Amino acid sequence: MQDITVRHVRVLDDFKLDLTFSDGKRKVYDMKPQIWGPAFKPMEGNMRFFRKAFLWMGTVAWPENIDIAPEELYANGVENE
């Protein structure tokens, strides 16, 4: 299996991401269950910070060195036509 990367990200309301992957699939990923603990502290309840999401090295990242593995996004995202 080839490595899956994120090619496009669009921030949705309620801490969700609309993602397009390197294999062409589109999925929506709900970040709410991930936003806890020190790694994600800056975005806890903070949509303004969450909206700063950007593509970085094939995945989604935020300022303050926050990112999430593309494999997690792909495996647990819900397919979006």
Give names to the regions the model predicted.
Residues M1-E81:
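Motif-centric detector for short Cys/His coordination patterns
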